[in-house]
């Protein structure tokens, strides 16, 4: 039985939806993919936090009913999202497990940008800007940017392939602050070997690049 984890990709229904959207866009509204996305709409609505930002890219090729269904789901999703984000003063999804949460913060910043583009009357630009502010220094413990070489002060000792040199890779983004339960935020500035705080991960960096470009577009 297929199980999604780490390098295996996401849930099969998620991957099917992503592929359908990409093929719809690539074929400029190909009928098989429009039909499939209509069939997948219940999946998109159920897993909106993962799929909503992807599904809105299909709107130009779908009927008005598809867009209105996404809008209704987005309104419900936003109520729960705002409730969750209000639990900390930064207004972002801070991780409370054993891994720093910079990736999920950058991902939310990027995802909400796409939702803002499609539904500016429902989603504002503040989610994207708050997310970028967080990874660049507005976070617990310090004001050090999680992105090496980006920001006035940035993480210059990290878990990359040169970690034994206590060095860094420009542009790499670390996971960041870990909340040691119940309430102690930790980020070691000078010890690179705690990978759950300091490891560079490729998809995290690409997510930051997407979020940074989104914030730049909003600021123009």
List PLM regions with ranges:
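Short hydrophobic beta-strand that contains or immediately precedes a catalytic carboxylate
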Residues: 89
